[in-house]
Amino acid sequence: MSTPAKELCRLGLREAGAGVAAKAISSSELVEASLARIQATDGKLGAFLAVSADRARAAARAADARAARGERRSELDGVPVAVKDIFVTKGVPTTAGSRILEGYLPPYDATVVERLEAAGAVIVGKLNMDEFAMGSSNENSAYKPCHNPWDLSRTPGGSSGGSAASVAAGQVHASLGTDTGGSIREPAAFCGVVGVKPTYGRVSRYGVVAFASSLDQVGPLAREVGDAALVLRTIAGHDPRDMTSSTRPVDDYLAPLEDGARGLRVGVPREWLSGGLDAGVEAAVRAALDTYRRLGATLVDVSLPHSKYGIGAYYLIAPAEASSNLARYDGVRFGLRAADAKGLKEMYAESRERGLGAEPKRRIMLGTYALSSGYYDAYYLRAQKVRTLIRRDFDEAFRGCDVIAGPVTPSVAFKLGERTGDPLQMYLADIFTITCNLAALPGLSVPCGLEAASGLPVGLQLVGRPFDEATLFRAARALERELGPLPAPPEP
């Protein structure tokens, strides 16, 4: 008797892969369940910008043939996943959530897409996002907003909103997102899933539509810590096509997963719990810290004194890099072109005016101003100096602890439309996550409960030393094992 499609969709990534390996279920069954789930729910969620049903079915048939021959490529072989629409996919539209890339069909795959497919994972589609990954609510998508599965009137977070919503709603078993200032961890916290921003350079950025090149990093989202660890192990590693890619060997993140929290030193930054947090979020975070103490970890008071300057530094550095990266969208080489323009100069201006949304335009203006003659030293250079101070703060804190723990966001998921009229309020959603990117450190969001008042998920942020993702997974798994899984969100 076959397993109902809804039950297949709620299987963990490794659980689904094990079922295919044991021939208890087929990849084709998993993919059909995923496609049916997307068809049934995405009209309300808006998590997908494109679904590649025919390609997914063909990949599933190939995975089933490999399983029949006993030639499975990995634990991911035959399992449905999806990727943020910021990764180029050969022959499949890639928009980065922007009208200026509407209709663009890349001639190649991003490295992370290649690695997923080489492992046998079945990519069923491309996920909704804020335009060029600029946003914290997914409301900056040029195509449609994405909704939180826990409450359709609320944001799933951004910019990887579709990546988090699709996993939380059971449309796919895992997804990929990007994180420039919190864009994996914030949606993961809002949607009650696990989200990982690896160390800068741990995962190749080749084939990722660039926002801020010194901050962007690729990472997984999944419903279980171990599943996220498996996906990261699959996509991590050196890539000669990315000059920022590290040659450091990739750890086996699954090996220490069940080692528990005993003996860990958990740093708690006093600046992160000294105000500005909603009461329900603070209560859940403090309860998670108490859980670590009960499990045998030692809580250590640490200080990150320059973290208060993180937002200011980030919103000088990131827009400066974005203004350079987005200069390539000129209507000449690819993407939208103002064909009715009279002359080259007008074509440049009109193509960008019609193709770019309000938030990219705002950040291009900010970045161009920060880099302009007479202001470079006063703004951009000073922001880079603050970045160095933030990195030194973390270095000093890690002298006395193994991981740093605190909130991911100041609040639970907020209402759609609540902050769109106030960009500064929107930017403050990333106040606890941005410093991790500025310091190039690995960070992770793991569910730590539901806020009592709203019943919405709260995430705990864990930050580690460079390239020590293994300790983050160990610490996150200890909490996950003790607290148990969150309930599934309501049916859309």
Swiss-Prot record:
It holds the Pfam family Amidase. The keyword Nucleotidyltransferase does not apply. InterPro entries: Amidase, Amidase_CS, Amidase_dom, AS_sf, GatA. Its EC number is 6.3.5.7. One of its GO terms (cellular component) is glutamyl-tRNA(Gln) amidotransferase complex. The active site is at K84, S159, S183. SUPFAM superfamilies: Amidase signature (AS) enzymes. GO terms for biological process: translation. It comes from the Bacteria. It is an enzyme of class 6 (ligase). Allows the formation of correctly charged Gln-tRNA(Gln) through the transamidation of misacylated Glu-tRNA(Gln) in organisms which lack glutaminyl-tRNA synthetase. The reaction takes place in the presence of glutamine and ATP through an activated gamma-phospho-Glu-tRNA(Gln). Heterotrimer of A, B and C subunits. PANTHER family: GLUTAMYL-TRNA(GLN) AMIDOTRANSFERASE SUBUNIT A, TRANSAMIDASE. This is Glutamyl-tRNA(Gln) amidotransferase subunit A. It comes from Anaeromyxobacter sp. (strain K). The gene is gatA.
